Curated annotation (Swiss-Prot):
InterPro entries: PsdUridine_synth_cat_dom_sf, PsdUridine_synth_TruA, PsdUridine_synth_TruA_a/b_dom, PsdUridine_synth_TruA_C, TruA/RsuA/RluB/E/F_N. GO terms for biological process: tRNA pseudouridine synthesis. This is tRNA pseudouridine synthase A. The active site is at residue 51.
Amino acid sequence: MPTLLAFLEYDGSAFFGSQIQKEEPSVALALQRGLKSMGIASKVRFSGRTDRGVHATRQAVSFEVPYKKSDWGYFKEELNKKLFPYLRVRRLYPIREGLDPRFEAKSRAYRYLLSEEPLSAFASRYVTHAHLGDERKIQEAMKLLVGWHDFALFKKSGSQEKSTLREMRRCWLYRYRSYWVFYFEANGFLRLQIRLLVGALLKVGRGEMSLEEFKEQLEAKRRFFCEGAPPYGLYLCKVSFESSIWEVRDRNH
């Protein structure tokens, strides 16, 4: 059967994370149930996990389907009807048989949305309300993040990782309408890494943590801060792959 790479978007506030939980709703379970209702029992393979409350606009998942290319448009439309309203397939691409996007992804990117203005009841699950502080100090701290670093002091306590070394390729802070947006792009991320980084950067902006202290924690010398920002403002927004994974160049809309 053809292996497809699906790019998903989902409302993380409706799920207890992307991975299957014992008794709680998850993105993977919702997708598996949607596929099963169409007679597809394929294993679903995610490019990476997102925790409870974290959203995605471009999560990558692979699975096999018993449909020929001419039927993929119909398949996507029918599947989205079953996934509505919290989960949606945006695009489908054919890839080489059996590939796992977790191991094939060359980079991932996240955005974190913050508002200094009071939020409406409808926005509180999608944006974090907090005081930013000094933008220039935060930008200086974010420049320190670019490159290879040992993020051992910016990960979830107790999480098991073969290596805590990651390459931060791009990161910056910018203004979008009434929001502040933190952008991070790396070859991979540790659990809670971005939320811990945002929490520390906000401490720097407010003058509660010096640039030198931030640098020491980044160099895994000493922990000054270990409280992560809330999950609600965090979005997985991009997963990139080498061109060699694609079976064909044409894409299905």
